[in-house]
Amino acid sequence: MWRLLATLSCLVLLTSARESLHFQPLSDELVNFINKQNTTWTAGHNFYNVDLSYVKKLCGTFLGGPKLPQRAAFAADMILPKSFDAREQWPNCPTIKEIRDQGSCGSCWAFGAVEAISDRICIRSNGRVNVEVSAEDMLTCCGDECGDGCNGGFPSGAWNFWTKKGLVSGGLYDSHVGCRPYSIPPCEHHVNGSRPPCTGEGDTPKCSKICEPGYTPSYKEDKHFGCSSYSISRNEKEIMAEIYKNGPVEGAFTVYSDFLQYKSGVYQHVTGDLMGGHAIRILGWGVENGTPYWLVGNSWNTDWGDNGFFKILRGQDHCGIESEIVAGIPCTPHF
């Protein structure tokens, strides 16, 4: 009995010691500590010479906000594959492979939405309608329903706005693609890059209901609408079934400073300071070395993480990843 108590005491002491350790976000010490834990992922440097205020602003999702109506369950009788990647399932939909950059703005809530909406429009049209839905239009014109623009927002509000007001097209910064391309430039949060430095500053651009010069059709005629928007229960199989049937979804989770250093593998929180809530696009799932994961697209450019993507533990609502899933069905004709 005393041996069992001694073992339990040691485990408690080890856990307490680990939790009491503090590493500066983005530090070598944090990277080294993570990689010594023999966990399911590898850490490295993704951010160089950036203000911590910038990194915190990237996490611009207000968790636990307004809820959309929950979609009726339909996964019970479905037989789902052990792994699934929307990029491979719908190869004629190029937006699924795309990674965007939110720049110095807490607009992840808008990016997660417009990325998944773009994917779903293409999927529903069987590849006949390929459009980059405008993050700029969502960010600047949604208003109070979505939150506070570059200072943070609600994914549920974004999907509701799409069904009520519609969204125009718009590509990446300086792409001149679509009606309203993104106006906030990418910034250099990596090493030896050519982009301007990242800061925590940045106001929300103004809502402009005019397409950029030379683009047709008009702003009003360029709108793409959702016919429904909804939440999905915190159920692993229901989320998988939704992605399998209709395409990528938007999710949100709690970010700690160790996540900033993700390079490869299946992320599980190890240690680090709370950074905030972050919205992303979930596009598949799988199992890596026995660990189930969600396949996720981020909005921090392609030189973050695994070419802009990451994997996170699946099935345990890790960091709340399964608690705030939202999606919707486009009004795009179904072919």
Curated annotation (Swiss-Prot):
It comes from the Eukaryota. Residues 18-79, 333-335 form a propeptide. Residues 1-17 form the signal peptide. SMART domains: Pept_C1. Its main location: other. Its EC number is 3.4.22.1. It catalyses: Hydrolysis of proteins with broad specificity for peptide bonds. Preferentially cleaves -Arg-Arg-|-Xaa bonds in small molecule substrates (thus differing from cathepsin L). In addition to being an endopeptidase, shows peptidyl-dipeptidase activity, liberating C-terminal dipeptides. It is an enzyme of class 3 (hydrolase). The active site is at C108, H278, N298. It holds the Pfam family Peptidase_C1. Disulfide bonds join C93-C122, C105-C150, C141-C207, C142-C146, C179-C211, C187-C198, C227-C331. GO terms for biological process: proteolysis involved in protein catabolic process. It is a peripheral membrane protein. Keywords: Acetylation, Cell membrane, Disulfide bond, Glycoprotein, Hydrolase, Lysosome, Membrane, Protease, Secreted, Signal, Thiol protease, Zymogen. The modification N6-acetyllysine is found at K220. Glycans are attached at N192. GO terms for cellular component: apical plasma membrane; extracellular space; lysosome; melanosome. One of its GO terms (molecular function) is endopeptidase activity. SUPFAM superfamilies: Cysteine proteinases. CDD domains: Peptidase_C1A_CathepsinB. Belongs to the peptidase C1 family. Thiol protease which is believed to participate in intracellular degradation and turnover of proteins. Cleaves matrix extracellular phosphoglycoprotein MEPE. Involved in the solubilization of cross-linked TG/thyroglobulin in the thyroid follicle lumen. Has also been implicated in tumor invasion and metastasis. Dimer of a heavy chain and a light chain cross-linked by a disulfide bond. Interacts with SRPX2. Directly interacts with SHKBP1. This is Cathepsin B. The gene is CTSB.
